[in-house]
Amino acid sequence: MKKTIAAFLITIMAILPSQAQQKDIQVQKRDTFEFSFDLPIYVEQLKHELTYPLAWRNCRNMTFDVWKQKARAKVLECMMTPPKAATSFSPEVIAQEQRNGYKALKIRFNVNAYSRITAYVLVPDGKGPFPAINLLHDHGAHLYIGKEKMIKPFGVSEEVAKDAQAWAENLYEGQFVGDYLAQHGYVCFSIDAPMWGERGREEGVDRSKYDIIAGNMMMLGRDLCGFMHYDDIASTDFLSTLPYVDKDRIGCMGCSMGAYRAWMLSAMSDKIKVGAAICWMVTTDVQMSTADHKREYGGFANCLPGLRQYMDYPDIASLAAPKPMLFISGTKDHLFPVRGVKQAFSIIHGVWQSQGADDKLDTELWDIPHSCHKDAQLKSLQFFDKYLKPGTTASSITQRSKKQKSKSNK
């Protein structure tokens, strides 16, 4: 019950301004208006005009490969001008520590020509190369930490360490996803998205400034959300160059905004062979709904200008077909109404079915809130093992877990 309440509070944090912000707001109202509940009052008319002409379901007059090429090109166009590519990644290990069955590294590298960033990398003990997972952190209206939500940090301030642990307790049932997967033989990798963690504001964290910064980026002809996706693609390219990584066995995973990043990365990068997205899938019709009293809460975090004129969320995610994909959503997730999730899953299945690959697509609705608890992490591990470690069984996962617990208790 406590975990359910904690997960619900995280959801609320993403929706409501702080009490201090509320006090500062001086509301002046006119008798007439054109926006209500943060949506235009003509939202239903606008949605009716969205026909999604580049969705696979509306492009059956061309081959799947031609559609994929055209649709990807449109997504890239809507991501706007990319950051200039780095001439080299120039990686540098700046810190490391031995953990239970794996080594934790901090690596600095050039993700693009403008940004040299820090990544956490976990490398299993033993002889590689190993399969690898690019772990994509959530939003949560909490920007102070990013990669530290996915991999237990080290060599950081006490404040960062405590914040990361508290976040893991709330959204991930006390288990860092990266450390869990590393114990089961995966190289795990995570970076901060722009605006999170070590890529935030010099003046300090202020969620209200995110949209202002995103608007300023647009004035420069760039899109902040697009930069996030370009960085996810580039960081996967970097991950594939590491000597202990099998470049043909790379997956990605995330929860909430991390799930959105995961299916976007799966759709846009051929280096990703399998993906897992926990608690982020819906149709625009339900996401922006007066009937469901719903609207988008992430702001510019998942805003690619103009893209909705061509494809809906499930259509974009379907660019990942026919590779293996796992989607888990929650019936108690207040951000994504079940009927919208079911609509999206139906569209996605139609694409995989058209390619004779529906057996590689797993979409599940669990009785959970907005979260990525241990059961979801186990399911993701099993899914990764199935496609990145053929021959692995559920019993072998159990045996590995017992061995790790035994080592921890010594």
PLM region descriptions:
Residues 20-103, 111, 146, 397-410:
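N-terminal targeting or regulatory segments adjacent to alpha/beta-hydrolase or S9 domains
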Residues 320, 327-329:
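Short beta-strand/loop motif that positions the catalytic acidic residue
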Residues 346-403, 410:
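C-terminal catalytic histidine-bearing segment of alpha/beta-hydrolase fold enzymes
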Residues 96-156:
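Glycine-rich active-site/cofactor-binding loop and its immediate structural neighborhood
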Residues 128, 135-230, 240-241, 286-289, ...:
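Cap/lid segment of the alpha/beta-hydrolase catalytic domain
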Residues 244-256:
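Alpha/beta-hydrolase fold nucleophile elbow
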Residues 212, 216-219, 234, 274-317, ...:
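Mobile cap/lid helix-loop segments that gate and shape the active-site cleft of serine hydrolases
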Residues 332-340, 370-371:
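Acidic catalytic loop of the alpha/beta-hydrolase fold
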